[in-house]
A protein has these predicted regions:
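The feature captures the conserved acid-bearing segment of alpha/beta-hydrolase catalytic domains
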Residues: 167-240
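Alpha/beta-hydrolase-fold serine-hydrolase catalytic core, especially in secreted/extracellular enzymes
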Residues: 237, 246-308
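Secretory targeting and sorting signals
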Residues: 1-34
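Short amphipathic alpha-helix adjacent to the substrate-entry channel of hydrolases
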Residues: 75-98
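Hydrolases whose catalytic domains are alpha/beta-hydrolase-1, hotdog thioesterase
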Residues: 151-155, 213
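N-terminal cap/lid segment of alpha/beta-hydrolase-fold proteins
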Residues: 32-60
């Protein structure tokens, strides 16, 4: 969960499950190029169990660390992660357990970025790894959901702070871009948006049906994001769990706002725009054209606001 949804997580009683989904009538077209096959394997990153998704072909692949929502198991992001990997990323999705305000659970923290850089270097050097000599060790990008999104935003400033880190620490020099879903920088228990003094590009993907991290909160955070490039990419019909394999994963605070876009369409849309944003910020001219020119017009479910 993000800063705002942390107050929801702290409740001991949770609301009933969300209303039934309504299947969307429109499906956004995929980019013209065919996606490569993707494989996966289990590993550990600094002691955390992690799933790694990667294209079966290609070299010098940048690493994308995915920071989970609070108490959302990594398995719930398998479709999103595999889709993101199909665009040419090594996607690492760890389960990170720690104690936060006296409660133990799945809570990501900024130190994971540095751990992932170390893991990537070791994996690239490991002859037994399927990623041996295939990783771009100099490029790290972040994707995050909810609390993981807020953690990624904290890292985007160059200095991760509590509660998004156990202790304050700096972002690794390899970090080049951030994309979030269902994230904001609203001060817990208030409607006050804190400024994001980012030093790397940040893209906010926002479900317009999100009842946990609302569109107004996301837009307020975007408006107070000082560094550029930045983008606010709204997705019609997705709620807080539009990025997961299914609605309201077990253990996580539910979103009672109903999603109206088909779940599979929502996940594909969020993953595609995540990939295109990250590629655009790491040197792809085709992705820049997609993000800033053609993608919005081609996707009936998405509206993009940006500052280059």
């Amino acid at each position: 969960m993000n800063v705002t949804s942390f107050r929801s997580w702290k409740r001991t009683a949770v609301a009933a499950t969300a209303a039934a989904l309504v299947t969307a009538l429109t499906v956004a077209p995929a980019p013209a190029s065919a996606s490569p096959a993707v494989a996966s394997y289990a590993t550990t990153i600094n002691g955390d169990s992690a799933d790694v998704y990667y294209p079966v072909t290609g070299t010098r692949l940048p690493v994308a660390l995915f920071l989970q929502g609070a108490n959302v198991d990594k398995s719930n992001y398998s479709t999103y992660a595999a889709t993101l990997a199909s665009y040419g990323f090594v996607v690492a999705v760890p389960n990170h357990t720690r104690s936060l305000f006296g409660t133990s659970g799945l809570f990501p923290e900024g130190a994971q970025a540095g751990w992932t850089v170390d893991w990537a270097e070791a994996e690239d050097d490991n002859p037994a790894s399927p990623l041996h000599k295939r990783i771009d060790e100099n490029t790290l990008v972040l994707s995050g959901h909810s609390f993981g999104a807020a953690t990624a935003l904290s890292l985007s400033t160059g200095l991760c702070i509590i509660p998004f880190c156990s202790i304050a620490n700096t972002a690794p020099g390899e970090l080049e871009a951030v994309v979030t879903y269902g994230g904001n920088y609203i001060l817990s228990g208030t409607s006050i948006a804190l400024p994001v003094l980012n030093t790397v590009p940040v893209g906010y993907i926002q479900g317009l049906a999100d009842g946990v991290a609302t569109p107004d909160e996301g837009l307020s955070t975007y408006n107070l994001t000082t560094g550029t490039p930045k983008a606010f990419i709204s997705v019609t019909g997705t709620n807080h769990y539009g990025v997961t394999n299914g609605q309201n994963p077990a253990g996580a605070a539910p979103d009672t706002s109903a999603q109206t876009l088909d779940q599979a369409v929502g996940v594909e849309t969020i993953a595609r725009w995540s990939a295109q944003w990250l590629l655009a910020q790491t040197g792809s001219s085709a992705a820049r054209k997609y993000v800033y020119t053609t993608g919005d017009a081609a996707d009936p479910n998405v509206t993009v606001t940006y500052v280059k």
